[in-house]
Amino acid sequence: MSYAIETFDPEIFQAIENERERQTNHLEMIASENFTIPAVMEAMGSVFTNKYAEGYPHKRYYGGCEYADVVEQLAIDRACELFDCNYANVQPHSGSQANGAVYAALIKAGDKILGMDLSHGGHLTHGSKPSFSGKNYHSFTYGVELDGRINYDRVMEIAKIVQPKIIVCGASAYAREIDFKKFREIADEVGAILFADIAHIAGLVCAGEHPSPFPYADVVTTTTHKTLAGPRGGMIMTNDEDIAKKINSAIFPGLQGGPLVHVIAAKAVGFKHNLSDEWKVYAKQVKANASILADVLIKRGYDVVSGGTDNHLVLVSFLDKEFSGKDADAALGAAGITVNKNTVPGETRSPFVTSGIRIGSPALTSRGMKEIEFEIIANKIADVLDNVNDSELHAKIKEEMKELASNFVIYDKPIY
């Protein structure tokens, strides 16, 4: 049986080729995106895609799972080593699935949860009204102050008033370090479970470039892509055996059926990469590159929320500009620089328009770019923002960025 994609399905083949070309020639600067290594992609495309394996290692509902058990146990063991925890569930299909499982395992419908406001940098699954987390639970929010930072005393005040069952700490657009110890103190004060979502910063945490949520958080979730640069997926971790059992039941049979064994194999490969000395060097460079990006944009007169960054992302506000985040996103895209429009603290526009953009350093750092390239790119971003309607300038910068990108090819041959 041989069905080479190029001849069997030329439409899909062409779409893949076009996307590979786009990723190669454009500068990917969406903070939640990264480039994974070929070994991860090979595992994703392996024969494990054919295998059903409902249950957990050595406790399956299907036969023929002996090798599925091997890869899942490797993924679990490596995850626990990576984050210095006792239990890990590597089956969640996504970060949102992982977060949903935490709620399902530990609280009831209608219980109170306290998470970061979406427009202040939180995530949909932290209690936003359109999300299941805002519909199934009674959600409340905390935010950032005028300086763009979390005021932990204010979070304590809100928690005392709300008396939530779960406090969610973590964000999707917060550029500063999260103080998990202070969140632990707040949770203890009101008798709440502390749930840390480290999806955006996990790759920094495991390299020692951001404080760990352990031992402070009761339960921790993450995606396995983003700063971890693995396959798209989710994971849940804890040091509490009782919570681990509840989490396992919430994932299967609660929210999911058969796990994606090929993805779990890829997660294990990704974790091996994250455990290397090379990874620590990479994570340090991710932060250094983001810092340069923030510094240049500030020098060029742009409002960087919180005045800088401690991690992999930079949030830029256009509340004082006539153009919107949507306008900036489109202009930068035309210049060969891919970012995403993003809400900002004090947002006045709709979520489809926004007053800001979120920019990240992980993907370009994976391509080998360092401070010198990020200084060039940051200035080009500022040039575009200074001339958001100048299509001729955008086209010129696009060619310049394509030339820069050609020196940092991420995949030298197709991986399929």
From Swiss-Prot:
CDD domains xref list: SHMT (cd00378)
Positions bearing the site annotation: Plays an important role in substrate specificity: 225
Reactions the enzyme catalyzes: (6R)-5,10-methylene-5,6,7,8-tetrahydrofolate + glycine + H2O = (6S)-5,6,7,8-tetrahydrofolate + L-serine
The entry's keywords: Amino-acid biosynthesis, Cytoplasm, One-carbon metabolism, Pyridoxal phosphate, Transferase
Signal peptide: none
Compartment list: Cytoplasm
Protein EC: 2.1.2.1
Cofactor section: pyridoxal 5'-phosphate
A biological process term (GO) from this entry: tetrahydrofolate interconversion
Domain of life: Bacteria
Sequence positions bearing N6-(pyridoxal phosphate)lysine: 226
Recorded GO MF terms: glycine hydroxymethyltransferase activity; pyridoxal phosphate binding
Binding-site residues, (6S)-5,6,7,8-tetrahydrofolate: 118, 122-124, 350-352
Pathway note: One-carbon metabolism; tetrahydrofolate interconversion; Amino-acid biosynthesis; glycine biosynthesis; glycine from L-serine: step 1/1
One Pfam family hit: SHMT
Any GO CC annotation of this UniProt entry: cytosol
Subunit description: Homodimer.
Protein family per UniProt: Belongs to the SHMT family.
Known role: Catalyzes the reversible interconversion of serine and glycine with tetrahydrofolate (THF) serving as the one-carbon carrier. This reaction serves as the major source of one-carbon groups required for the biosynthesis of purines, thymidylate, methionine, and other important biomolecules. Also exhibits THF-independent aldolase activity toward beta-hydroxyamino acids, producing glycine and aldehydes, via a retro-aldol mechanism.
The protein's name: Serine hydroxymethyltransferase
Organismal lineage: Bacteria, Pseudomonadati, Campylobacterota, Epsilonproteobacteria, Campylobacterales
